[in-house]
Amino acid sequence: MRALAEQSVDNLLKLVKGEDDGVAAAEEDSGLRAKTTLVEDDLEAVNRLFRERKWTDGLPVVPPTRERVEAMLAGTPRKPEEVIDLVAPGFGAATVERIAINAVMAGCEPACMPVLIAAVEAVCSPEFNLQGIQATTNPVAVWLIVNGPVAKALDMNAGPNCLGQGNWANATLGRALRLILQNVGRALPGVMDRATHGQPGKYLFCCAENEEENPWEALHVERGLEAGQSAVTVVGAEGTTNMNTHSKIAAEIIRVVAETMKRPAGNDYRTGGEPWLVFSPEHADVL
């Protein structure tokens, strides 16, 4: 079995030296530029190799064979060699091909590619501060929220247990983004990822917004896009905290939210941050 895998190279050093981006040429007839690694035709052997080379999140992966990667690339018109951006903290070049490789490993389908490319563009934007998020001792994870027609097309979960298990698109998109952050950004746990304890959201953290039952503007519309557009939003999230109130009075719901948010010893209280609230339809309707 031929497993396509990215080279473990110090891309930042190569960029400083003016060298290439560290993507080795594959076989001449492959049409792909990633390094080709020959592996025994056995799923366990592939996963053992990937674990040894720290190319996984610790869970089994789908072997990114040439055929699977080429099929994944069919999900976008963008060229495989196009560099979307450099992913901190290792500043590896996130080519469309590399995004596709990690998407295959995570179990994505080709229709996921536009979402993943947009997510990479978002996390690499300067205002997101991916360097800080990836290298901090804080257990922060990247939360991916999807809006618009693409969320419907992928049948993403925006309802009960939307941040939990059970939905293929939520799970594979979130996992693919994490693999990109680790494999392209080189945020290896205990090396460049310095999280003291981490959190489960660092495996995957992805959902869609329930636009139909949202009494306010959809998130992407609130942030300047059109209602009919597809969009992704990325958030640096520490984790989830449940707020328990059965009140039907708006002021009481807001009081509970404020009391829960205070967290006097938390990072946001001490250094600032943007609270991120997720309301159930029942509470949103009251407010």
What feature does the model see in each segment?
Residues 1-4:
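Short, glycine-/small-residue-rich phosphate/pyrophosphate-handling segment
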Residues 8, 12, 16, 28-287:
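Non-transmembrane, aqueous-exposed alpha-helical and coiled segments at domain scale
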